[in-house]
């Protein structure tokens, strides 16, 4: 444990941010997995709904800094391409 008060605070803040980032990334992975399952099952209407949800979550994660903006944009693009190929 750190001896300096500001360092102790930083440890607490980093722990909170790490927990939040881990939660957000887990939600993203789950949402993407559900989208991919819908596409593979051929359930295109459900896949479209899931894609909009994934886009929203990725945009929020990028806004919070959990995921880089370019990375989020690239993932959204690739998922949209995957849906369009399935159609």
Swiss-Prot record:
Any single GO BP term: translation
UniProt keyword Ribonucleoprotein, yes or no: yes
TM helices/strands, residue ranges: none
Keyword Ribonucleoprotein set for record: yes
Any one of the GO CC terms: small ribosomal subunit
UniProt-listed InterPro entries: Ribosomal_bS20, Ribosomal_bS20_sf
Pfam families in the record: Ribosomal_S20p
GO molecular function terms listed in the Swiss-Prot or TrEMBL record: small ribosomal subunit rRNA binding; structural constituent of ribosome
Keyword annotations: Ribonucleoprotein, Ribosomal protein, RNA-binding, rRNA-binding
PANTHER family xref list: 30S RIBOSOMAL PROTEIN S20, SMALL RIBOSOMAL SUBUNIT PROTEIN BS20C
Protein name per its UniProtKB record: Small ribosomal subunit protein bS20
Native organism taxonomy: Bacteria, Bacillati, Bacillota, Clostridia, Peptostreptococcales
């Amino acid at each position: 444990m750190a001896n300096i008060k500001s360092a102790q605070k930083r440890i607490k803040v980093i722990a909170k941010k790490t927990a939040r980032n881990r939660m957000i990334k887990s939600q993203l992975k789950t949402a993407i997995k559900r989208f991919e399952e819908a596409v593979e099952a051929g359930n295109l209407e459900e896949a479209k709904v899931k894609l909009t949800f994934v886009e929203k979550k990725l945009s929020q994660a990028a806004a919070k800094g959990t995921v880089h903006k370019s990375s989020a944009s690239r993932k959204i693009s690739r998922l949209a391409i995957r849906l369009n190929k399935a159609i």
